């Protein structure tokens, strides 16, 4: 049975993953750090939405194009490399490869009603996120999160 996925729910889970990956206590961080974490969670949520939209745009291959598989295929297409090479990519490598697509993704207005970009900045989103937290680490994003939350999510 499909259960609709709230973008806010995904955002909160990503925020929790980031805190855990960096061994940070939600109540032990200052407001400046909190903004960086929220900004990064927003960016990773957009990344996850981009991958899901990519999967849906490839209907004939949709069953295997989810999570990291979709990211690998997108990196292969963008860089014209083999899947064997792309499978070695870390989350930071994938984000670096796809950052323009992520930044350019426009989320639906109903998504933005629930989640606002928590910190407006002239710095490109990826650079802003890396300023405080460093490079993206694999533990920040669980490629199967969407499916665990929804048991085959739908938008």
Task: Annotate each predicted stretch with a short phrase.
Residues 1-120, 147-155:
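An amphipathic, hydrophobic-aromatic interaction surface with interspersed Lys/Arg
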Residues 125-155:
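Intrinsically disordered, low-complexity, charge-dense segments enriched in Lys/Arg
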């Amino acid at each position: 049975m499909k259960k609709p996925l709230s973008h806010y729910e995904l955002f909160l889970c990503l925020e929790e993953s980031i805190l855990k990956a960096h061994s940070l206590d939600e109540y032990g961080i200052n407001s400046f750090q909190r903004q960086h974490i929220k900004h990064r969670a927003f960016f990773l949520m957009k990344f996850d939405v981009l991958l899901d939209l990519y999967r849906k745009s490839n209907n004939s291959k949709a069953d295997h194009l989810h999570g990291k598989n979709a990211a690998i295929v997108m990196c292969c297409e963008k860089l014209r490399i083999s899947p064997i090479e792309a499978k070695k990519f870390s989350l930071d490598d994938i984000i670096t490869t796809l950052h323009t697509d992520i930044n350019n993704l426009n989320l639906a207005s109903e998504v933005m009603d629930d989640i606002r970009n928590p910190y407006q900045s002239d710095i490109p989103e990826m650079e802003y996120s890396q300023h405080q937290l460093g490079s993206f680490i694999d533990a920040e994003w669980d490629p199967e999160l969407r499916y665990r939350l929804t048991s085959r999510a739908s938008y």
